[in-house]
């Protein structure tokens, strides 16, 4: 068990202080400079001959990135490079029309324009026009292609001859789009193609951070934006770590940087971007996207959704969820009340979400792992004489993932031992069969979701979140949460095992002592086996007539 202070939950930049001071004056690094994998592959592809005619590049499906790829290709190949954002047969292939006199007007297509060079297209265009692919494939394999006759009802004095082309194709798209290409043609995953990807982030190190600062300076210059000050770079690093959900990685997306820095320029003096201007831009973005999260908090405050942040309850715990809403640009956190009740039975733990077809496969897997750990911890020779049902209360949509398995375990052992759970503490984390607490996703959103509820219901000074220790490097919390941790209003505990988590939420050790949770469960089982089962309702009715 480890209660964290505010420094523990804040990304540390101490080792890069000297580099931060020089960041504004570091030489510019273009987008391509920070994509060595892509650049090396483009270089190889430009020198390839023979049957490999297609290069697949996994990247954001955006014309901006295709322009970057085109510029990278220009440095390796002195050849025609044609980009297309639309695809139809009339534009793709050579075509001709015949006038009333039988004269021909010839128009070259994109493939003809890219002859002896490269054609760059988005994967979506091929997916939207699968019927064109056989002809495209034939053309890039240097087979003869007939030009299209746009006036088939008119006779011409002559017909343009068929032609073979020497064209290489570069297809860009996101991973899911590239995967769908394989359904059109299996050759997309054969020696017919090469593959590379645009890297979306960069690992934090002295050299990489130098390159990253150079990239930011290049973006500011490329899009005529004010340059960042030392403090501005500091705020950008924190925002980048929040975006990647990792203190050891920074984003490389030009679109993300351009939007944030352009917005920050509206809050600046027009000359430089400092800490305050970037902070205001981030606050502005948060405000624009916070309607749904605020409505969720208001539903809790109005009592429409029951979430308790004070007192104690047996068999009830505050879990943490991340909500992904279609059409909403960001995920947000929301606490969920998880409850468990037990009754005499055969040891079965009923997953209500699964039975109601609201629980996904990963959630079901987490439930089974949690049950296996508890059975092992109790060291039972036979099944529990109790059955239990666990449910996400007031949950009306699908629940998936194993990140609630630690909370569900705490809830189950609370009901079995009749030991209350502190409602001031919310829990997130996955559990393995040995009781180790494993990392989960969406930590920042989950913590902030519970924080907002505690803030509006009133801080007690003892509220907080139990989270996996292995998730510490993913923390980049909102400044309000950091401030409350500084002031002792809100707390975060990191744990590595179930034995560390149970004492925080139940104020009792999990095992090893007389008053342990395992001891109480064992005692209850023993009492049950020692005494005769209570009469059922049927037996009592029979006794009335004896």
Language-model region placement:
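Conserved ASCE/P-loop NTPase catalytic core
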Residues: 1-182, 187, 194-205, 213-230, ...
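Peripheral, non-AAA+ core regions of ATP-driven protein-machinery
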Residues: 1-27, 40-45, 108-111, 120-130, ...
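Short, surface-exposed charged micro-motifs
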Residues: 339
